[in-house]
């Protein structure tokens, strides 16, 4: 029997609950007025709501610039592969959903951590000798975002801190700060294909550090860490006894010239909570099915972390049951050709975009190795009329109707993030417009006229 299934009966021992609505001798004991409460309206948002802040929304929503009405808008800012319709999921995936819906078996509640059969499928799919998994090691969630939310909630208390990459996915900070958790930013190095500055990372760790977040492959960088670099990260975590939250939502989405290494396959010493989901690899972000894989071969987490994840998952009573019902077919029947074609398209677009932008004076793109993005440095000294990356992107929208995300959204100013999921024709047009924009606004830095005359 699934150890997480709780059987309730009328003879169960439930905690007593004080009910103030009782009658004694036919008279109500409910007081006419509660002491200490002033009878006037005073409804205010909670501290958690007030501390919740999404940098992307704050920056993008405050951009007042309208696109050029003479040019069709091209958005290179949204990390949703379904937006343009050129990257549909595989027919086997949609058929699996139809079959699950038509069966009528998945219209009710499931255990809050997911059906046992669905967790068994995930465990089987990701199991390997270097990182064995069973159903008890899997928590199903409402998307990878909720998986990250649960991991932070189970590992860190208010007043503790977590280590987050810079540049990095803004949701880490949004979730952590809403819980009263301090965020410490460790640097990724563009000159080293966005590897972690390991010395700075280790320097940030203190007695209040609750976990280290490692995002590989990376959003927003499109980088993929080598096996050797991952081993160095694990060595830091092992030395400092810091557990890892591995955001691996883009796992296996790497280009043909490199290899993806799941972090848990490289260590038996460091406890790891790996977060993933259907959203990106299967191109269905709206279906909201994610998971946490608990890797803890030395039993450092013990029962408390596992039980904590179960309790936290009960706050929303689990992810969509219909998607859970389709999960076996999605995992088993999606053809390898689907994954190959998706990655071939992304690599082709990445090469196209990188080549075009690298030829533009004043821009310094960093070649990606996976995921759906690349980062582009702006040599701001050559664009003196713009104060920062936010102004650069605002004017790019106003003049060329091309929208990229300023990397200030990812705590990394004077870069922009480009999404590479758009159709090829659109990518070519966007790069052409970016070139035109840069040529119009580029200025030689003082003392470098010779370079400009080339």
From Swiss-Prot:
GO function term, MF aspect, one: identical protein binding
Phosphoserine modification, residue list: 448
Positions where N6-(pyridoxal phosphate)lysine occurs in the chain: 280
Alphabetical keyword list: Acetylation, Aminotransferase, Disease variant, Intellectual disability, Palmoplantar keratoderma, Phenylalanine catabolism, Phosphoprotein, Pyridoxal phosphate, Transferase, Tyrosine catabolism
Cofactors: pyridoxal 5'-phosphate
Enzyme class: transferase
Record pathway: Amino-acid degradation; L-phenylalanine degradation; acetoacetate and fumarate from L-phenylalanine: step 2/6
Keyword Acetylation: yes
CDD domains in alphabetical order: AAT_like (cd00609)
Top-level taxon in the UniProt lineage: Eukaryota
Reaction equation(s) it catalyzes: L-tyrosine + 2-oxoglutarate = 3-(4-hydroxyphenyl)pyruvate + L-glutamate
Residues the record lists as N-acetylmethionine modifications: 1
Biological processes, Gene Ontology terms: 2-oxoglutarate metabolic process; biosynthetic process; glutamate metabolic process; L-phenylalanine catabolic process; response to dexamethasone; response to mercury ion; response to oxidative stress; tyrosine catabolic process
Segments crossing the lipid bilayer: none
Cellular component terms per the entry's GO annotation: cytosol
Documented EC number(s): 2.6.1.5
Subunit structure: Homodimer.
Family stated for the protein in its record: Belongs to the class-I pyridoxal-phosphate-dependent aminotransferase family.
UniProt function note: Transaminase involved in tyrosine breakdown. Converts tyrosine to p-hydroxyphenylpyruvate. Can catalyze the reverse reaction, using glutamic acid, with 2-oxoglutarate as cosubstrate (in vitro). Has much lower affinity and transaminase activity towards phenylalanine.
Illness the protein is tied to: Tyrosinemia 2: An inborn error of metabolism characterized by elevations of tyrosine in the blood and urine, and oculocutaneous manifestations. Typical features include palmoplantar keratosis, painful corneal ulcers, and intellectual disability.
Protein name from the UniProt record: Tyrosine aminotransferase
Organism name: Homo sapiens (Human)
